[in-house]
Structures are given as C-alpha cells and as structure tokens.
C-alpha cells in the first residue's frame, strides 16, 4: 500500500533495545498486528443468551422501514437477498473463527488465519453497517434531529465508525499481502 508508510533510514539502536532479529522489523510488526487482531476479536462483546439472531435484526429493521409483502417477507426482493447473504457470511465467519480458536489453543499462538479473519471480518462489519443504513432508507443517514430515534442516530454513527475497521489492526491491503505470501505461498 502506498500510504501510511514510514521508513527509518540509517536508524541506530542499541543491541539490547532490538526487538527480534536485525533487519527483520516487518516480521515483528506483522506478529504485533496479528496479536492486536486477536485481542480485538476477543474483546468484542459476547452474544447474550436472549439476543436476537442477526437475521431477525436485519429483517425487522427492513420490515419496519420498507414494509413487508403478503407473506411477511421483506418487500424489496433485492434487499431480501442482501440480508440473507450478509447473515450467511457472518455466520460462516463466526463458525470458522470458533473452529480456528479451538485449534489455536493447542498451538498457543494465533496462526496465519487471523489475517484472513481480520480482512473478512472487517469487510463484513463494514458491509453490515452499510446494509443497516440502506434498510433504513433516508432514516439511515441522519446525524441529528428530534424527528429521529436514538437508534437511528446511533446507526449513522456506527456506519461512519465502521468505515475504519478495514484500516486499524492492519489495512485490508496489508492483510491481502500477508495472505498472499504466508497463507498462499505466492512469491514477492
């Protein structure tokens, strides 16, 4: 990625201050980002026992703002498909993440899969926020007004906040590079 690059030319450090091997700073940086991603994933709030499945949350939002057909389905067939796709992708990531976390407990270190999870997870977070805004129509992008609910106002703020998830913890472009080299074994 051509942005957010920092180069230290002719930098001098004492040997005892060196982290990792000499001239292997990127390897140390990648490992740090890997642990940061792992910590971010673990710090997310756990699902409550009585929490509605995401499908119900998306569907109820869509029905509230867009209406429903005679069979109780979301009126807009395209958005209905988008809701199902988002929910299936989120569920697939959740199941795969659970499996890999269980496997990594035996190895003691996060594997290269965390780069995939960060990239896919952040993309799904971003697309989920975008979908929620689309489902709310014009109410999905309000900033302040007494005519809108606190939930509608927070939805807009969440959508804006979630735009950053593909950047922090290592941009998606950095993740793609790591995946290409470490997971797929592609050459530089």
What are these regions, as identified by a protein language model?
Residues 1-92, 165, 181:
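Glycine-rich beta->alpha junctions and the first turn(s) of the following alpha-helix
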């Amino acid at each position: 990625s051509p942005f957010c690059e920092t180069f230290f030319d002719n930098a001098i450090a004492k040997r005892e201050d060196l982290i990792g091997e000499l001239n292997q700073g990127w390897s140390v940086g990648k490992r740090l980002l890997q642990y940061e991603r792992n910590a971010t994933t673990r710090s997310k709030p756990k699902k409550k026992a009585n929490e509605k499945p995401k499908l119900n949350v998306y569907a109820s939002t869509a029905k509230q703002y867009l209406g429903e057909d005679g069979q109780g389905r979301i009126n807009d067939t395209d958005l209905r498909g988008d809701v199902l796709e988002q929910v299936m992708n989120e569920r697939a990531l959740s199941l795969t993440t659970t499996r890999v976390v269980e496997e990594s407990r035996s190895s003691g270190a996060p594997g290269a899969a965390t780069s995939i999870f960060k990239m896919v997870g952040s993309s799904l977070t971003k697309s989920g926020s975008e979908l929620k805004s689309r489902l709310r129509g014009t109410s999905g992008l309000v900033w302040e007004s007494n005519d809108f609910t606190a939930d509608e106002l927070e939805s807009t703020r969440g959508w804006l906040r979630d735009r950053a998830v593909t950047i922090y913890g290592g941009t998606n472009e950095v993740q793609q590079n790591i995946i290409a080299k470490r997971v797929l074994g592609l050459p530089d």
